[in-house]
Amino acid sequence: DICMIYHADMYLMPGALDSIEEHLTDKTIVSLTRIEPPLHPDGPEKILMDFGVEPEEFKETELLEWFTKPIDSTGGYQPKHDNPTEGIFAPWAFYKKDFQEIGGHDPLYAPQSKEDSDIFNRFQLNGIKFIQTWEGCVYHMTCRGSRRNTVDKAKNIYEDSPEWLAQNQRSTRNFIRKWGHFVKHDSLMKPIIPSKYDIGIVLDNNNMELLHALEP
């Protein structure tokens, strides 16, 4: 069985599923390339192009016209890489057996934040190869779920909601406790997993404020 982790604020572009089927083999995970409005900095792993941030302003017709132009035409979709790259970010497609083999998502991070980085690390340690196809894409409005959702008390689409900030802090501390470091990846979103050592600090005259600062 093939499954996919997919965000609610993503729009599947033509040919995306065909590209997944082309590249998905045993012990691989295939990510689609994200086309995003410029809410976050640009990077070598995605395409910045503004076709709307909110569903109500989504310019679907303009997006499809831009995307379906020949790749060598002026003003159309231009992949940043000629060949698939090695990285992982939503949406990602995988075989159900590979997901079950590592126990799925760790409930430590429920309801959200850092659960994706955690499972990416575990996939990599279990021998999974990551493939990002540049022939298959999604349009990603970004942060329309909870992070910058004004319905969830975010002041605007450029500021994180209080609920997301609090949960992100909890999940970040749990990630550091589990892995011994903060989330790390290369410029193309392939996980970097440093070695973890059994170390500790002995404190004298301790208090809760100091413990909170030193122990994640």
Question: Model regions: which residues?
Answer:
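A short, conserved beta-strand element in the Rossmann-like catalytic core
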Residues: M10-L12, P37, A110, D118
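Alpha-helical elements of Rossmann-like donor-binding domains used by nucleotide-donor carbohydrate transfer enzymes
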Residues: G15-S19, D118-R122, R170, N174
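Active-site loop/turn elements of alpha/beta-hydrolase fold enzymes
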Residues: A8, R34-I35, E135
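Conserved donor-nucleotide/metal-binding helix-loop-beta segment in metal-dependent transferases, i.e.
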Residues: G15-L32
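C-terminal, non-catalytic tails of nucleotide-sugar-dependent glycosyltransferases
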Residues: I29-P84, A90-A93, K129-F130, S146-H212, ...
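Histidine-centered active-site/metal-ligand motif
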Residues: H7, H140-T142
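A short, conserved alpha-helix in the catalytic core of glycosyltransferases
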Residues: I20, E86-F94, D98-G103, Y109-C137
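Short beta-strand-to-loop acidic/aromatic patch adjacent to the donor-nucleotide binding site
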Residues: I2-Y11
